[in-house]
Amino acid sequence: MSINDKPIGFFDSGVGGISVLKEAFKLLPKEDFLYYGDSKNAPYGTKKVEEVKALTFNATDFLMSKGIKALVVACNTATSVTINDLRENYDIPIIGIEPALKPAVELKKGGKIIIMATPMTLAEKKFANLMDLYKETEDIEPLPCPGLPELIEQGIVSGDVIYNYLKDKFSKYDNEKISSIVLGCTHYPFIEETLKEVTHNKACIIDGSFGTSRELKRQLKNSNMLTEENRVGKVTIFNSREDKDIIDLSYKLFNMK
């Protein structure tokens, strides 16, 4: 098999990275994708750094054994902790994801920018460096959201539980003064509709899925690694939990409008 026809690997701590996979498949509909969700060990956002690194390397080795031509680390926490180490150890294009703060700043709406993310993403140096770029000019507030990925891993993406969680998190803010909400975890796009409801649709909601997918396409194109086949690509999903329910949930989220 030529490198062009090899699949693209996607990895996340659970089902969250499927939000990025959806965007990538729209952008690259002829490509085959292999997705590995580590739901057995989710969430990563509250684990120790060394544990996240070990789990990320295990997942990458699994996907490499399947013959992938590129890897998307569709997990903010794993990206912030491990991306440099991965690039040093594997000789394929590796694309990470980080909170889409730049697009939020470029909107220039003048209000508060809230960054929802896991505690570990917000604690890492990579995030501190990102904040340093804008902290002098922007009103930016990190909002740690522990427990939210776990709910989404259970397939709870709407209803009273999610509404009440978000209502509690945003109770300290004046919705009129929020310009943008940056979704700094790939699980969060699945609760976007409820987030709009809680904030009365006042803020722009931004996630990094499109930017990451566009970067994937750019790197593959520049390396002449895009498939040359004129066909519809396919998506195959694996999960460390190895039970039918999590695979069914994964495909359900992938097909969610």
Swiss-Prot record:
Its EC number is 5.1.1.3. PROSITE patterns: ASP_GLU_RACEMASE_1, ASP_GLU_RACEMASE_2. GO terms for molecular function: amino-acid racemase activity; glutamate racemase activity. GO terms for biological process: cell wall organization; peptidoglycan biosynthetic process; regulation of cell shape. It catalyses: L-glutamate = D-glutamate. Substrate binds at D12, S13, Y44, G45, N76, T77, T186, H187. Keywords: Cell shape, Cell wall biogenesis/degradation, Isomerase, Peptidoglycan synthesis. InterPro entries: Asp/Glu/hydantoin_racemase, Asp/Glu_race, Asp/Glu_racemase_AS_1, Asp/Glu_racemase_AS_2, Glu_race. NCBIfam families: glut_race. This is Glutamate racemase. Belongs to the aspartate/glutamate racemases family. Provides the (R)-glutamate required for cell wall biosynthesis. The active site is at C75, C185. The keyword Isomerase applies.
